[in-house]
Amino acid sequence: MAGNQRQGVAFIRVNGMELESMEGASFTPSGITREEVTGSRVYGWKGKPRAAKVECKIPGGGPIGLDEIIDWENITVEFQADTGETWMLANAWQADEPKNDGGEISLVLMAKQSKRIA
C-alpha cells in the first residue's frame, strides 16, 4: 500500500556524481510510443520504440561546465525521486545542444533502455 508522500524533487547522477539539478527535472522511461490507427473508424494502435530520456537544468558556474557536458557519451545516468523510485540509464549520451541561458544549463540525456532499480 502506498503512503502519502508524492514526488517533490528528483536527484540526478551522472557516473555517480550528483548534478545540482534545479526544479522541473523530468524522466521518460524507454518503451513503446503508441499512435492510433484510424481510417473510417479507429482500428487500434501501432507502436514505435522510445528511448529513455532525462531532462533537467543545472546552474551555470557550478562544478560541471558546457565543455564537459558536450562530450558525455557512454555514461550511466540515475534518476531518483525523493519517494525512493530510482531508474538507471546505462550507456547513455548527451542528446541535445547544451546551452547556458540566463545562468541555467539545459541538459537532455538519453539511452536505449531504462531499468527501474528501486
Curated annotation (Swiss-Prot):
Pfam families: Tail_tube (PF10618). Induction: Expressed in the late phase of the viral replicative cycle. Expression of late genes is activated by the viral late transcription activator C. The keyword RNA-binding does not apply. Keywords: Host cytoplasm, Late protein, Viral contractile tail ejection system, Viral genome ejection through host cell envelope, Viral penetration into host cytoplasm, Viral tail protein, Viral tail tube protein, Virion, Virus entry into host cell. Transmembrane segments: none annotated. The keyword DNA damage does not apply. One of its GO terms (biological process) is symbiont genome ejection through host cell envelope, contractile tail mechanism. GO terms for cellular component: host cell cytoplasm; virus tail, tube. Disruption phenotype: No tail is synthesized. It is found in: Virion; Host cytoplasm. InterPro entries: Phage_Mu_GpM_tail_tub. Polymerizes to make up the central tail tube that is surrounded by the tail sheath protein (TSP). Tail tube protein polymerization takes place around the tape measure protein (TMP) and is probably directed by chaperone proteins. Upon binding to host cell, the tail sheath contracts and the tail tube penetrates the host envelope. The tail tube is involved in viral genome delivery during ejection. Homomultimer. This is Tail tube protein. It comes from Escherichia phage Mu. The lineage of its organism: Viruses, Duplodnaviria, Heunggongvirae, Uroviricota, Caudoviricetes.
